[in-house]
């Protein structure tokens, strides 16, 4: 190996160049030996992967389990909301107070919920009798368990004061309306106010979550209701932590959903939408059931595309079965990874649907690159040497890209990831990448060895029979010549490589390369990139987090229908926020009262403190000290029927003869708009800091906070860590690769593709949830997988001009890139027909990933690389210097030998 020093080049530059050359040659030598090993022992490398697949695949069938805890999967694993839940539950058990802590979709425990929606223009309050009939049907519904019949009254959550079932207050309002209708009174006699209304027993009740689509009486100071479109009723079940009770509750929920479907057929004037505690999990898992057949269709499409794109008219050099076997190689590696996952007690969830597509996109890239590497080898070499040369040419880059896949998804599986679904996905993806790499160089490499042996012995690539001689073919019909032709007629004197006749390679060489490097095309490509960058930047400014669980459910499921109706008619108020004062407080102190009022300002409050202050004022009672305050509270206020329910909101302690209030709770409800979730997160972020700055020590909690607390940060951390990891690896290897500009261009290309996918998916109404984040991590690797070979071939090319270098790069790697991206995109098409929000997100993100990568590899990079470094002039100068030196030597020889001139 000889290294010539440039004039003026420092010694360190020489050493770095030597180190890069040694590393590159060392890796190529290792891959060459690996190829020789595989070519000499193909049966062994074919058998071992097959045995592994059979072993782990069969084990997976016996251990298949699904994940039933949705909170564990999609809620942030470590959040302040979970700590607040633990503290709040230690003070006031959540199972007893879940009726007060209303939450849209994340109510804890078991329950049944129904929305009754009237026809457009109708007032649902005038249909009280029909709604109460539905209510009575629920109350009388029975479920059988071990010979005993259970009704709602056996399973319901009981009130502490009278041990009756906890029911929504809207039921009491409807009873009053029905009685008024029966007694021929006008509905004006029953005053329904919104959001707070006064019940018959004297209580003030918040019904903002039970009455929807409200139209108030114009100019009404007391917020009287003129009409309403929807009513929401929730039936809360008690579980007691018993497995038997939980089983009975599950049966009751199933019967409840069946009853709602039956009642919908009977009540044509009302639309019924039901929800139960298991509905979200059922509709989340439903995506997997809906996708089964579509995944098989996707596999068939990829197999067909790979087979056709690997074919040629030349029956000797065509490799259709290698394309098919390459896809099957990736499939069995995925099956092995799934077996390992289930053997290690993994539980399946619908987010893992992306792994086959992710692994296929990377695995088939290695398959097509090996096929292209085989075509670039010399035909006159033995097939074992050709396999080794193909490994030496391809496996270095494939090893590097596989390592980056492992690093990025390994970082996603690290403890820094706060979403369990993302962590599980990344762990499985790491295993899939390792097995993918092993199966490509072993199983598919063995298939390549057998195919090479058939080609060397001149066997037909499809029928595996000997190819007749040219003289024999000339005497046969045209159809026989077409089927059995080995391409001897197509090969001309100026084109000695028969593989140049592959239709993709021929198209790129003869048509596309000349067109894309045309000087008149380049301005339009620059304009196209500016448009691409503008839309991407515009989308990046509109990113929104996807904390809503609806993004992961089947789109035609009852849960999604319920959530849409709920969002439309019950979005005026946030979920009920529990305001827990967990330290003793001087409630009788005027400054404390002012602080409480200031904290509760802007909220609709359901507060014992506010009601008590009003009671003292109305009764003209003075309670300015601790003794009077607590005495009147216990002996008078809490004993009145309309205030007895506040007993559950205060914790008293007795020290000697003195009573103390050690903790209490209030309920706050914020006014919201259609974007309820975002506004609730803003309210939470504003209230929490106040608990540290104010003299009142409190926490705020609602069950939905567990799913939304810092979700946007939790979900974006994996892609940020993965991106940082890729950037760090590329920077650290800046001086180890054969040309540093290759890494520089790779960083720019990957950044452009990543930001393009991020911006365009936002414009396509894709939120930042766990699925889109996983796709963004994959985009980093997919871009590197396809851009790296193209860029490194370009920077190492020694042609005279950049245009010739990019043509050479496209001719060398363009076929494999186009084959892989085309197969990848065609394989995504069946996902479009799965009625699921999860698969819609997966389809959109992966389609943008493939599309943006294709755009950069075949349009943007071929044009931009002709404008910017690396310059190819020094190669031209070197060749001119060598030619000039050779001419001078020839002249000297002529001068020294005059006889030669005379002879000539």
Swiss-Prot record:
InterPro entries: Patched_domain-protein (IPR051697), PTHD_SSD (IPR003392), SSD (IPR000731). Pfam families: Patched. Residues 291-450 form the SSD domain. It is found in: Membrane. One of its GO terms (cellular component) is membrane. Glycans are attached at residues 149, 625, 820. Keywords: Glycoprotein, Membrane, Transmembrane, Transmembrane helix. It is a multi-pass membrane protein. Could act as a repressor of canonical hedgehog signaling by antagonizing the effects of SMO, as suggested by down-regulation of hedgehog target genes, including GLI1, PTCH1, and PTCH2 in PTCHD4-expressing cells. Belongs to the patched family. This is Patched domain-containing protein 4. The lineage of its organism: Eukaryota, Metazoa, Chordata, Craniata, Vertebrata.
